[in-house]
Amino acid sequence: MLMPHSAALNAARRSADLTALADGGALDVIVIGGGITGVGIALDAATRGLTVALVEKHDLAFGTSRWSSKLVHGGLRYLASGNVGIARRSAVERGILMTRNAPHLVHAMPQLVPLLPSMGHTKRALVRAGFLAGDALRVLAGTPAATLPRSRRIPASRVVEIAPTVRRDGLDGGLLAYDGQLIDDARLVMAVARTAAQHGARILTYVGASNVTGTSVELTDRRTRQSFALSARAVINAAGVWAGEIDPSLRLRPSRGTHLVFDAKSFANPTAALTIPIPGELNRFVFAMPEQLGRIYLGLTDEDAPGPIPDVPQPSSEEITFLLDTVNTALGTAVGTKDVIGAYAGLRPLIDTGGAGVQGRTADVSRDHAVFESPSGVISVVGGKLTEYRYMAEDVLNRAITLRHLRAAKCRTRNLPLIGAPANPGPAPGSGAGLPESLVARYGAEAANVAAAATCERPTEPVADGIDVTRAEFEYAVTHEGALDVDDILDRRTRIGLVPRDRERVVAVAKEFLSR
């Protein structure tokens, strides 16, 4: 497939795109929202030959898309609750991401359930049956065992090798299964957005949308305060938990999911995600997951979040206590608030069907997505899961094509490599040999281009001692990934900002690259 456009996003391209839109005619599609669903729609539209612009009032991955567990789920939880369709789709989409779209960003994550005395025979049998069902889903989805190994039981000696702080009294081995894990969710959003730009989409951050109808939007550059009207044959609302601001007829029920951040040393540097059944629940777990930058993310919760929707949700003290109490049931040495070095919370844009009633738990609300058309003709997509973003984008775009009689090719994203995948290395393909492993892990085949494009001094040195992010990555965030301010670099292009003390150490370095 031809890719005549650059994948680079930066201030100059943003300015040129805004000028072109203000001076030009109508587009085929306008997408509102720069999370994973929105960028997925922009990529799908661009690769079908449609003219498309995406506008985001903040930065890419500003909302829910950066607050996930960083997992590409195979749908096991949905199978356990009877949602066979979602489970199968999740397994299929996981396989597409791991083998075709983004093998450089998604890898197999071992999930360890330690068999402790507190876990009775019935619960053990249910977990084992669930893991076997997960194996069957993997086979059904066509994902090879070389990509996601089969589940199995392991002895206690192996359990303590891969999760050294697990409780050893009465440990009877463990159950080990595998799921997909992203190097980072915001990095996936960035890869999809830049691949969309590579195919001609205009990706515009810090641009607000108002007076939205099915064929027009008033856009305001939030940096210059200049506004202009833009027309399109289809306007798609992919604003996530903020979708109701675009179409007030939508009924959403936001659910908050909280994670705590630890230094991996607090868990003795595990190599598997410690997976702890939540007491009293059949198919819910708390995960302590090894992550990039030497961190552990512990999550997650599922709590009703009524009321005004904040830009940056905050964890509650009750959620923090719940996560610590749950994980400590499986640890020989307890972790506490003194060990927590950061925390984050995100809001799931669940559809409020009214069926569960006011007292129903958000954990029981469907994770399926839905497409709606407002009285003014705005097409909205709400609900869904990160794993299914590609399928959701295909679904809503098919609906838009039908409703608006757009002339478009068939969907091409199932087999489309994102920027950084081996088949899409960028303009300076080369080996990652000699480059920091963490750089290659975050950029894949594009890592050589990150280093080659750097004009700064000491490009492969870390931005600060003990922080495994290179100076070249800060520069690339500005020159190729559309970062316009310090928060863009620290909170979304890299995830240094999840740990406040690390953030403080590199703010000056980020400002240095923004001022160049």
Swiss-Prot record:
Signal peptide: none annotated. Disulfide bonds: none annotated. FAD binds at residues 28-56. One of its GO terms (molecular function) is glycerol-3-phosphate dehydrogenase (quinone) activity. It is found in: Cytoplasm. Keywords: Cytoplasm, FAD, Flavoprotein, Glycerol metabolism, Oxidoreductase. The keyword NADP does not apply. InterPro entries: DAO_C (IPR031656), DAO_C_sf (IPR038299), FAD-dep_OxRdtase (IPR006076), FAD/NAD-bd_sf (IPR036188), G3P_DH_FAD-dep (IPR000447). One of its GO terms (biological process) is glycerol-3-phosphate catabolic process. GO terms for cellular component: cytoplasm; peptidoglycan-based cell wall; plasma membrane. This is Glycerol-3-phosphate dehydrogenase 1. It comes from Mycobacterium tuberculosis (strain ATCC 25618 / H37Rv). The gene is glpD1.
